[in-house]
Amino acid sequence: MSAFIVLGAQWGDEGKGKMTDYLAENADVVVRFQGGNNAGHTVVVGEKEYKLHLIPSGILYNDKLNVIGNGVVLDPKALFEEINYLESLGVEITPDRLIISDRAHVIMPYHRILDGIKERARGNKDIGTTGKGIGPSYTDKMERSGIRVCDLIHKEVFEENLKETLEVKNKIITEIFGGRALDYNEIYNEYLGYAEKLRPFVKDISVIVNKKIKDGKEVLFEGAQGTLLDIDYGTYPYVTSSSTIAGGVCIGAGVGPTAITNAVGIAKAYTTRVGKGPFPTELLDSTGDWVREKGHEFGVTTGRARRCGWLDLVILKTSARISGLTSFAVTKIDTLAGLDTLKVCTGYRLNGEIIDYVPASLEDLAKCEPIYEEFEGWDDSIANARCYEDLPENAIKYLKKIEDFTETKVSIVSVGPKRDQTMMISEI
């Protein structure tokens, strides 16, 4: 393969960081194409644990080029905090190993302020934002009032853009929400400092990535969040502000669709989501609590407890269709060891009709009753399994059901957080 995508097939938190790290071993380039520092990836290498938010997971290898694409919204403060964190763990970050799109939009202090103010104003209709300014930054991008990285590193352009934009933002903050105005000089001086630190990393990434593909290099596109958080195909409005599906790669990294050869959907062996919104297979009982504790289901970025439920094959089938997935990588199947019986959702009953897709309307999704098929569980710990044949027979049946229902093969199975707790069972 030459260019392939790794993306979340559920509501995020599926283990994309680990899978990207695993697959990056054979890649030359790793590209983040959307989202911002609202994403959280945990990668375990040996005895070390790394928590990443902005920087691609390929940074943990010494010989990979890592790319932050134009579809990402970049918080310079968060970026340099992450760089310092990684360097403290012995990871070298240089312009030879990390490049940033000159077209990426910059998260400004007023984005974070407005994110928090608007969320509080929603009251009990809050959408569960991380408060990091992601949504407001994408809003400015679409309103054509955003500041891009190429603007930030040109002093005169940045000065003019900041003056115009801050005047409007301060009116919104003070006159509509009753907040305190932000100081122009304080922001200007802070971000000029970031501009100089960013400058060596800034490139036209579309030119570089396409040349790598043309030269036959292996390019891995790393998604953040998940399919059901996509701005168009997710459970709107409880979604993120970017395109998390395969189509987002073309926009967020400047490559054409014909360049993509494979798309791998990462899916937990059960389902989780953070925040509000319908969740047909949610477990609101002791089983849900058990899965949450055993699976350590707490957000990397927010620390929030994740809602847990049975595996929903309707969601996986929807993800496979929308992104043209060529295979699934199933993670955390080890978490399910010890349950006598497992349930898998194979359809929804909505207004007397059985459907096998996720409806657009939240009201309809909230009415959906899951139709379950039961499977016998397995008692054995499978954390030491290193090939398909090491898995219990019931675990293999469980994986086969995923393949049969979604008409998409399972190519990778993960049985723990470490690199070596991963088995490739077929080509992706």
Swiss-Prot record:
It is found in: Cytoplasm. Pathway: Purine metabolism; AMP biosynthesis via de novo pathway; AMP from IMP: step 1/2. IMP binds at D13, E14, G15, K16, N38, A39, G40, H41, T130, R144, Q225, T240, R304. Keywords: Cytoplasm, GTP-binding, Ligase, Magnesium, Metal-binding, Nucleotide-binding, Purine biosynthesis. The active site is at D13 (proton acceptor), H41 (proton donor). Its main location: cytoplasm. This is Adenylosuccinate synthetase.
